[in-house]
């Protein structure tokens, strides 16, 4: 009888110990599941941060490309303005050369006109001399008539040259007026281009400032990209570590569940044995 009582006490203590171990295992299982849930939340948060980091990186790269495209467009516009200024400068030089040539032609025509006037005056003087010397011999008269005829021819040629010179002078004056008009238009265009160049210069300075700011932003973007890349790598590493931890915890949960099941089976066996013992005692 004492042996049975001792056995019952031992079985009762074993039952209590089994209950304690079961409660401890259940508590450990709950803690493990909570840790697993926390790690899964951290993992999901890291995934969201990783996606946000990639989006930030894409946006930064897009902004950098936009700044570079605007800078290249501005450089092309500046080059086009410089080419236009060079072309107008060449046209102005050509107009100045045309004006100089027109002035030279005008000077030449004036000289020829003066020569023609002198020849006409000389012919008139010869004619008057011939009239005063009308009493000379026939040979002298013939000679003088020839000289007069020659003088008239020279005068006619001088008149023709004068008319030609006057015509050329009129053409030259028209050309000069046109050249002056073109020169005025060119000067106005140059003034306009100088104003545009001033504006372009101001724009260039602004663009240089913007370019410097863009370079600073680019450096900042690059630093941000490096930081985001490092954070992304760190997040990926943490995510990988979290996956490993979740896997370990899942294995631990499975082990604890198996151990809890084993303890429950032991508890059931002890309970069945106690029930059988009580039934046996009741039979006495």
Curated annotation (Swiss-Prot):
Residues 1-284 form a coiled coil. The keyword Protein biosynthesis does not apply. Residues 32-41 have a biased composition (Basic and acidic residues). InterPro entries: Tropomyosin. Residues 44-60 have a biased composition (Polar residues). Residues 32-60 are annotated as: Disordered. It comes from the Eukaryota. Keywords: Coiled coil, Repeat. The keyword Transcription does not apply. PROSITE patterns: TROPOMYOSIN (PS00326). Tropomyosin, in association with the troponin complex, plays a central role in the calcium dependent regulation of muscle contraction. Homodimer. PANTHER family: TROPOMYOSIN. Belongs to the tropomyosin family. The molecule is in a coiled coil structure that is formed by 2 polypeptide chains. The sequence exhibits a prominent seven-residues periodicity. This is Tropomyosin. It comes from Mytilus galloprovincialis (Mediterranean mussel).
């Amino acid at each position: 009888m004492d042996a049975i009582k001792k056995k019952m006490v031992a079985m009762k203590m074993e039952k209590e110990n089994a209950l304690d171990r079961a409660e401890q295992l259940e508590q450990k299982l709950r803690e493990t599941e909570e840790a697993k849930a926390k790690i899964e939340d951290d993992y999901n948060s890291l995934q969201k941060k990783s996606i946000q980091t990639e989006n930030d990186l894409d946006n930064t790269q897009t902004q950098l490309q936009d700044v570079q495209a605007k800078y290249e467009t501005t450089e092309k516009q500046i080059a086009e303005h410089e080419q236009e200024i060079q072309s107008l400068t060449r046209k102005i030089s050509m107009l100045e050369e045309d004006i100089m040539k027109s002035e030279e032609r005008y000077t030449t025509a004036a000289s020829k006109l003066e020569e023609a006037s002198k020849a006409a005056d000389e012919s008139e003087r010869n004619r008057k001399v011939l009239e005063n010397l009308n009493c000379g011999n026939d040979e002298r008269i013939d000679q003088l008539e020839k000289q007069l005829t020659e003088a008239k021819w020279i005068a006619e040629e001088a008149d023709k040259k004068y008319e030609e010179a006057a015509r050329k002078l009129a053409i030259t004056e028209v050309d000069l007026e046109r050249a002056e008009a073109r020169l005025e238009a060119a000067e106005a265009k140059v003034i306009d281009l100088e104003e545009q160049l001033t504006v372009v210069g101001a724009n260039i300075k602004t663009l240089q400032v913007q370019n410097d700011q863009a370079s600073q932003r680019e450096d900042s973007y690059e630093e941000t990209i490096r930081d985001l890349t490092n954070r992304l790598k760190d997040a990926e590493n943490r995510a990988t570590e979290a996956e490993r931890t979740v896997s370990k915890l899942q294995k631990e949960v499975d082990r604890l569940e198996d151990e809890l099941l084993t303890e429950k089976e032991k508890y059931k066996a002890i309970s069945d044995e106690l029930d059988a013992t009580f039934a046996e005692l009741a039979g006495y």
